[in-house]
Amino acid sequence: MRPHLSPPLQQLLLPVLLACAAHSTGALPRLCDVLQVLWEEQDQCLQELSREQTGDLGTEQPVPGCEGMWDNISCWPSSVPGRMVEVECPRFLRMLTSRNGSLFRNCTQDGWSETFPRPNLACGVNVNDSSNEKRHSYLLKLKVMYTVGYSSSLVMLLVALGILCAFRRLHCTRNYIHMHLFVSFILRALSNFIKDAVLFSSDDVTYCDAHRAGCKLVMVLFQYCIMANYSWLLVEGLYLHTLLAISFFSERKYLQGFVAFGWGSPAIFVALWAIARHFLEDVGCWDINANASIWWIIRGPVILSILINFILFINILRILMRKLRTQETRGNEVSHYKRLARSTLLLIPLFGIHYIVFAFSPEDAMEIQLFFELALGSFQGLVVAVLYCFLNGEVQLEVQKKWQQWHLREFPLHPVASFSNSTKASHLEQSQGTCRTSII
């Protein structure tokens, strides 16, 4: 039977949970994960104190002036009167605040003194700080924002994916890559909803213990979907760069390689991360990343993909500028390249370049980082759907044709007006609806 939380410990845990949000994957942490760490420390402490009392020979030892004890957050070894005992900050505080402080007690003739300094001050958590309540409110607002963002992105992505799948004239390598990107954003949104539902549905102790394996699997799925999303953003950059830099290449062969890379490479890194977590940091539901070296198994490849996309973006702009300055380039090609340049500029946030700014950001910039990664990042799928589908001239033409055919079939005596003027329609008709006439 696990002990209940004392009021002082509850007061200490509240700001700890807030601080944990900056180290988790984008939502408020589970109370039972923190409790699990506390219980592990308690069990370890009681075992050490038991061995201390019995000694190496297994015989009962005389009790010193101050008997060893567990005070609900720290383990204090036995001591003789007149000595000051120092212990590290509790593990659950160190892993959440990344601060290595110390706590002290004096052993007197009357027993242990009070702990000094107070754990909340020595270990980097100020329970009297009025900003804790504001931060909690801010994080809850962020949660609402990213829930709305992922929901709207999910709806728009499903519609966009349905459109690209429904019209055969839109089936080509470029749109196949777009569809894989849509699926990665859909999985990212769904995994986020599943994570929130499983991890934060209950803080009851029995629930936490019974569903620990399930919530770890959810976190593995969540990390895979995040990495797959970044992988397909990189594939978009690689394909666009290849299209501009190489005159002739086998799109079918490249597509097979892109698919293997986009879905396969994240599986490798996530599997390595899961193995490392299981053997080296099997704490809670794996939603708190205290061991930086293990977390870099996930974070490193993501940052590398962002840097590669940034380099690709710079080179894409260089190629476009060179083509625009070439005198041999014809007028219609100049117009095409200008449209391509404008489209490429819109890809800056999609390539995740802004994440580089926060890759090694200090703790005081964490709230700004969370805003960009959660609030704005959740709408990324919506922007992708609009850019790659709803603003695509070929898609608009195919939808317009389908609408006109349906309207003529249902209302033959009432012809429908065209969505666009005749000049635009004629221009799109000349393209024959092929996927190769535009980049996005």
Curated annotation (Swiss-Prot):
Q: Which residue windows are transmembrane per the record?
A: 142-167, 175-195, 217-239, 255-276, 292-315, 341-356, 368-391
Positions in the Extracellular compartment? 23-141, 196-216, 277-291, 357-367
Q: Where is the signal peptide?
A: 1-22
Q: Which InterPro entries match?
A: GPCR_2, GPCR_2-like_7TM, GPCR_2_extracell_dom_sf, GPCR_2_extracellular_dom, GPCR_2_secretin-like, GPCR_2_secretin-like_CS, GPCR_2_secretin_rcpt, Secretin_7TM
Q: GO: which molecular function terms?
A: G protein-coupled peptide receptor activity; peptide hormone binding; secretin receptor activity
**How does the protein associate with the membrane?**
Multi-pass membrane protein
Post-translational modification remark: Phosphorylated on Ser and Thr residues at the cytoplasmic C-terminus by G protein-coupled receptor kinases (GRKs).
Annotated keywords = Cell membrane, Disulfide bond, G-protein coupled receptor, Glycoprotein, Membrane, Phosphoprotein, Receptor, Signal, Transducer, Transmembrane, Transmembrane helix
Q: Looking at the keywords, is Transmembrane helix present?
A: yes
SMART domains cross-referenced by the UniProt entry: HormR (SM00008)
Cysteine pairs forming cystine bridges in this chain are: C45-C75, C66-C107, C89-C123, C215-C285
A Gene Ontology annotation in the biological process aspect, one of them, is:
adenylate cyclase-modulating G protein-coupled receptor signaling pathway
State a GO cellular component annotated for this protein: basolateral plasma membrane
Q: Which residues are glycosylated?
A: N72, N100, N106, N128, N291
Q: Which residues lie on this side of the membrane: Cytoplasmic?
A: 168-174, 240-254, 316-340, 392-440
Q: Where in the cell is it found?
A: Cell membrane; Basolateral cell membrane
The text of the family note is: Belongs to the G-protein coupled receptor 2 family.
The record describes the protein's role as: G protein-coupled receptor activated by secretin (SCT), which is involved in different processes such as regulation of the pH of the duodenal content, food intake and water homeostasis. Ligand binding causes a conformation change that triggers signaling via guanine nucleotide-binding proteins (G proteins) and activates cAMP-dependent pathway. Upon binding to secretin, regulates the pH of the duodenum by (1) inhibiting the secretion of gastric acid from the parietal cells of the stomach and (2) stimulating the production of bicarbonate (NaHCO(3)) from the ductal cells of the pancreas.
Please identify the protein, giving its name as recorded: Secretin receptor
Species, as recorded: Homo sapiens (Human)
